[in-house]
Amino acid sequence: MRPGRLRLLVGLGNPGSKYVGTRHNIGFMALDKLAAQKSVSFRPQTKFHGLMAEVAVGSERVRLLMPQTYMNESGRAIRAAIDWFGLEVDQLLVLVDDMDLSLGRLRLRAQGSAGGHNGLRSAIQHLGTQDFCRLRIGIGAPGCTSEERRARTVSHVLGVFSRQESLLVDQVLDEVLMGLDLIQCLGLERAGNRLNAFQPEGCSAC
């Protein structure tokens, strides 16, 4: 993504009060924080199957989208917004949780597979390509073995952050918001050099 190219920022998550603050919804949490920082509110947009707001990122206006389709159908909302606004896929950035990354770590990528994430799988299916930018936000994995991970995945991603974890999440989301400005001003590669090396204070497990 070239500097100034970002036009659509999508946070992945599940709708409803039941899922507020859960690990799977950290993409929503990032957009909520950005909207609060910019003093804007999300409004329902049925044609996009989601909630939408608009903010300035760098010197450009960027639309924020939180699909309300549930995670497995996120791609429907993304496709609808891309088509309605006449955007190219390289103007899109998706914010998504990642169990393969420790809590506190970030990975900015220009493309890639779904990596087992149903929201990304839906986006790839509806966009017809995996060549779109995504910022993976680490939420850590449950357990120490593959068996424990499989058994506890659902409860982990649908669980809320502990009080101590929430302190790290605050730092991470601040870095994400700073990173969005870097992406818009400097482009994906230079922004990624910083974001991918980020480590929050007090995070020995990162």
From Swiss-Prot:
- EC number(s) recorded for this UniProt protein: 3.1.1.29
Sorted alphabetically, the Gene Ontology cellular component annotations on this record are: cytoplasm
Residues the record annotates as the site (Stabilizes the basic form of H active site to accept a proton) are: D97
The cysteines covalently paired via disulfide bonds are none
Matching InterPro entries: Pept_tRNA_hydro, Pept_tRNA_hydro_CS, Pept_tRNA_hydro_sf
> Key word Lipoprotein present in the record?
no
Q: Which reaction does it catalyse?
A: an N-acyl-L-alpha-aminoacyl-tRNA + H2O = an N-acyl-L-amino acid + a tRNA + H(+)
Q: Which GO terms describe its molecular function?
A: peptidyl-tRNA hydrolase activity; tRNA binding
Q: Which GO terms describe its biological process?
A: protein quality control for misfolded or incompletely synthesized proteins; rescue of stalled ribosome
Pfam families given in the database record: Pept_tRNA_hydro
Q: What is its main location?
A: cytoplasm
**Which keywords accompany this UniProt record?**
Cytoplasm, Hydrolase, RNA-binding, tRNA-binding
Q: Which family does it belong to?
A: Belongs to the PTH family.
Role played: Hydrolyzes ribosome-free peptidyl-tRNAs (with 1 or more amino acids incorporated), which drop off the ribosome during protein synthesis, or as a result of ribosome stalling.
Please name the PANTHER family in this protein's record: PEPTIDYL-TRNA HYDROLASE
* HAMAP family per record: Pept_tRNA_hydro_bact
Q: What is this protein called?
A: Peptidyl-tRNA hydrolase
Q: Which organism is it from?
A: Prochlorococcus marinus (strain MIT 9313)
